[in-house]
Amino acid sequence: MDIDQYMTDLGRRARHASRAMARASTAAKNAALDAVARAIERDAQVLKDANARDVARAREKGLDAAFVDRLTLSDKALNTMVEGLRQVASLADPIGEISNLKYRPSGIQVGQMRVPLGVIGIIYESRPNVTIDAAALCLKSGNATILRGGSEALESNTALAKLIGEGLEAAGLPQDAVQVVATADRAAVGKLITMTEYVDVIVPRGGKSLIERLINEARVPMIKHLDGICHVYVDDRADLAKALTVCDNAKTHRYGTCNTMETLLVSSGVAAKLLPPLGKLYRDKQVELRVDAAARTVLADAGVGPLVDATEEDWHTEYLAPVLAIKVVDGLDAAIEHINHYGSHHTDAIVTEDHDRAMRFLREVDSASVMVNASTRFADGFEFGLGAEIGISNDKLHARGPVGLEGLTSLKYVVLGHGEGRQ
C-alpha cells in the first residue's frame, strides 16, 4: 500500500464530506447517530467476533491484562457505546447559533455564528470505544473525521466503521464523514498530522510518548494535553472534614486518570492536624507516600509509614498509580508558586473557607480547570455538563479544559445590513 497516496485520498474525501456535514440538519445528524446505535445492537455478535480476534492477537503478543481489558468489547462496553450515541443525539446542536448580535452606529448588526472546524483527525490507542465516542461528537458538531486507532484494535475498528457508514448513509449523509484508517502502518500517523490542506485539527488521545511524538512532528494544530500533574492545596483556613474528603477522592477514586491528584500541598499551619488522619487513610489504601522533610516529621510522629523521601523529580511526575507526593508549604503564595512552576496546567484545587484566598487561587493558578473545595476528579466533560468530551486540553488557544461539542466548533463573524456602505 502506498501510505502517502492512501492518506491523501482519505483527506480529500474527508474535506469533501465536511462541506456536506457543515450544512447537515440536526435531524439528519441525530438520525445517523440513532441508526448507528441500532446497528450496534443488531450486530453485537459480529462486533464481538471481530474484537475477539484482536484480543487473541494481543494475548499472543503478551500484552498485559490492563491493555487487554481496555481492548475488549464486552456486552457492557457495547451497551455503553449505544447509550453514548443516544446521549450525544439528545444534546443541543451548537451549529448555526448566532450570539452577541448587536447594532453598530452605522446601522449594521454584528454577531458571531458557531460553525464546525471542518476535518478532525483523531489519533488514539487500542480502545475501540473511542471510535464510537469520537465519531459521535464529530458527527453531531458537523465535522468530518479521520480516525486512526491503535493497530491492536484494527479489526474491531474496521467493523465499527462499517456500521458508522451504514448509519450515515441511512440518514442521507456522506459515508466519508467518518473514515477509519485501515492500516497499522505507523507512517499513516506521520502523514495524517502533516496534511494541512485536508485536516484542520488533530486530537490525540494516548500516552505521553504518543503526545510527545506529535508535538515534535505535527504541522496540523492540535487539541491536546501532555501530562496531568494535578495538585490539591489545603489552606490553613480549610474545613478539615472537607479536606479529608477532597484529598481522598482526588487521589484514590481512580489512579490512572489525568485528573487524579499527584501532589498534595499542605499549609504549615494545618499540617499537624490534617496529615496524621490523611496519612493513615492513604496507608490503609496502600498509597505510597513520597514526602518532604516537614511532612515526614509530622507523619512519622503520628506513626504513619512507610515513607519515601521526595526528590525534585517527584514534583514533576504524573504517577498514574497509587503514589502521592506530599509537600508542606508556608501558605497560599508558596502553593501558587509551586503549582505554576511544577504543574501541567491541567487541574488544581484549593480547600479553604476563606473567600478572598479562594478567589486569589482561581485567578492566579494558571490551569485549565481550577477548583475550590472540590476534587480534581470533577474535571470531566460529563461532570461539567458538556454531555460528553473528546478529551481534555491544557493548551491556552481554542479549547481549554474538557472539550465537548462546542470545543469542536469555532466562531465566525456575521454581519446583517440593510444596504449600508461604510462612510
UniProtKB/Swiss-Prot annotation:
Catalyzes the NADPH-dependent reduction of L-glutamate 5-phosphate into L-glutamate 5-semialdehyde and phosphate. The product spontaneously undergoes cyclization to form 1-pyrroline-5-carboxylate. Its EC number is 1.2.1.41. It is found in: Cytoplasm. Coiled coil: none annotated. Pathway: Amino-acid biosynthesis; L-proline biosynthesis; L-glutamate 5-semialdehyde from L-glutamate: step 2/2. The gene is proA. This is Gamma-glutamyl phosphate reductase. It comes from Burkholderia lata (strain ATCC 17760 / DSM 23089 / LMG 22485 / NCIMB 9086 / R18194 / 383). It catalyses: L-glutamate 5-semialdehyde + phosphate + NADP(+) = L-glutamyl 5-phosphate + NADPH + H(+). GO terms for cellular component: cytoplasm. Belongs to the gamma-glutamyl phosphate reductase family. It comes from the Bacteria. GO terms for molecular function: glutamate-5-semialdehyde dehydrogenase activity; NADP binding. CDD domains: ALDH_F18-19_ProA-GPR. The keyword NADP applies. Its main location: cytoplasm. The keyword Cytoplasm applies. Keywords: Amino-acid biosynthesis, Cytoplasm, NADP, Oxidoreductase, Proline biosynthesis. One of its GO terms (biological process) is L-proline biosynthetic process.
